Swiss-Prot record:
It comes from the Viruses. One of its GO terms (biological process) is glutamine biosynthetic process. GO terms for molecular function: ATP binding; glutamine synthetase activity. This is Putative glutamine synthetase. Keywords: ATP-binding, Ligase, Nucleotide-binding. Belongs to the glutamine synthetase family. Residues 19-102 form the GS beta-grasp domain. Pfam families: Gln-synt_C (PF00120). InterPro entries: Gln_synt_N, Gln_synt_N_sf, Gln_synth/guanido_kin_cat_dom, Gln_synth_cat_dom, Gln_synth_gly_rich_site, Gln_synth_N_conserv_site, Glutamine_Synthetase. It comes from Acanthamoeba polyphaga mimivirus (APMV).
Length: 353
């Protein structure tokens, strides 16, 4: 399911005339926002975007409008099953934002990304997004398990209650994403205590960014149930601790075809020339993470390598062996807007010299 429509598995006569729609959008500071709408109408042939009405909200409360003209309009762009309302006709819609004149807001990065994706749709770009994050306690404002930690290392892909802090949240998140129709492809505990990762993809085009935003939304909703909160900051812990990234795996159809390694190397050269431009949208405070330590490259210099995790762009060994495949851009931070990152990679790689 790419999010455009799906058939309901539960069509109880008692509740088929009620639909609960969760509208999700990105606020003025890059944060997730949502509001709920109940529709008293029957949708018997399956949910489609055309079934979901445009809505609005108070943009002056989200740093996206002033009080004299505060209405901001939500245009549904993709639709998913709601894992929190399984016994009713519940859906989540990812929306982008427009003013009263239909002009996209400055913070509406989806609009500009979609222009790029439409321009290069014949390239069939695939993305695999590796979202790292920390689970924090509200009472200490520290990662869960931090009070027992000595040094990092034992927590990566760990098992056992002395190592694996927050697994219940991670497991519930994975199952909820699968129910929603998100192409989550895995999870693991990460290097620091309370640090986790989930992966989305491979997903083609702008759907990858839509799915990552909704996966984040689901994760943050689940964390509410445990009175915890999610931190995407690139370096929330100072000292000898790993930061959090959103490594972005990318390929076009030509890269995945025979002889694709040559296309990949040409793409790496293009990324090198646009390094500083990319870093502008690769996450706030990313300089605290990209130091050359803790499996990162320096933010000041572009580098690439085969199988290396201490470079800007990694080319997997299997890609070199096969002569085709994908590359991994390791520079994006965990707090990126995926619309900006996925689209700038596509534009840089595919634009003519």
């Amino acid at each position: 399911m790419s999010g455009n429509s799906f058939e309901r598995s539960d069509e109880s006569n008692e509740q088929s005339s009620i639909s609960i729609i969760e509208y999700v959008w990105i606020g003025g500071n890059g944060e997730l926002r949502s509001k709920t709408r109940v529709l008293y109408s029957s949708i018997m042939t399956g949910y489609k975007l055309s079934d979901i009405p445009v809505w609005n909200y108070d943009g002056s409360s989200t740093n996206q409008a002033n009080g004299s003209s505060s209405e901001v309009f939500l245009y549904p762009r993709n639709i998913y099953r709601c894992p929190f309302r399984r016994n009713v006709n519940g859906v989540i819609v990812i929306c982008d934002t427009y003013d009263v004149n239909g002009v996209p807001l400055e913070t509406n990065h989806r609009h500009n990304a979609n222009i790029i994706f439409e321009k290069y749709q014949n390239e069939k770009p695939w993305y695999g997004l590796e979202q790292e994050y920390f689970i924090f306690r509200k009472d200490t404002n520290q990662p869960i398990g931090m009070e027992y930690a000595s040094k990092q290392g034992q927590y990566y892909c760990s098992v056992g209650s002395q190592n694996a802090y927050g697994r219940r949240i991670s497991d519930e998140h994975m199952e909820a994403c699968l129910y929603a129709g998100i192409k989550i492809s895995g999870t693991n505990l990460e290097v620091a205590p309370g640090q986790h990762e989930f992966q989305i993809g491979p997903v083609e085009g702008i759907d990858a960014a839509d799915q990552l935003w909704i996966a984040r939304f689901i994760l943050e909703k689940i964390s509410e149930h445990y009175d915890r909160y999610i931190v995407y900051h690139p370096k929330p812990l100072q000292g000898d601790w790993n930061g959090s990234g959103c490594h972005t795996n990318f390929s076009t159809e030509s890269m995945r075809s025979e002889g694709g390694l040559t296309v990949i190397m040409e793409a790496v050269d293009k990324l090198r020339t646009k390094h500083s431009e990319h870093m502008k949208v690769y996450g706030i405070d990313n300089d605290l993470r990209l130091t050359g330590d803790h499996e990162t490259a320096s933010i000041d210099e572009f580098s690439h390598g085969i199988g290396s995790r201490q470079c800007s762009v990694r080319i997997p060994n299997d890609t070199v062996k096969n002569g085709y495949g994908y590359f991994e851009d390791r520079r994006p931070a965990a707090n990126i807007d995926p619309y900006q990152v996925t689209s700038i990679i596509l534009q840089t790689v595919c634009e003519s010299d």
